[in-house]
Amino acid sequence: MRQTITLACAETGERLYLTSKNKRNTPEKLQLKKYSPKLRRRALFTEVK
């Protein structure tokens, strides 16, 4: 079952992106590189509750 998760920037802490993932297939926390408007560059975003 897919669940909606929030992605937060590792450097600034801002929560900008929503995505979904299947927790059965990927139990570890998701990490994606996304654009951060505050930093004006791509940064690492990690899954938060």
UniProtKB/Swiss-Prot annotation:
InterPro entries hit by this protein: Ribosomal_bL33, Ribosomal_bL33_CS, Ribosomal_bL33_sf, Ribosomal_zn-bd
Record-linked NCBIfam families: PRK00504.1 (NF001764), PRK00595.1 (NF001860), rpmG_bact (TIGR01023)
Residue spans crossing the bilayer: none
Gene3D superfamilies: Ribosomal protein L33 (2.20.28.120)
Source species: Enterococcus faecalis (strain ATCC 700802 / V583)
One GO BP: translation
Presence of keyword Zinc-finger: no
Pfam families membership: Ribosomal_L33 (PF00471)
Key words of the record: Ribonucleoprotein, Ribosomal protein
Protein name (database record): Large ribosomal subunit protein bL33D
The family this protein is said to belong to: Belongs to the bacterial ribosomal protein bL33 family.
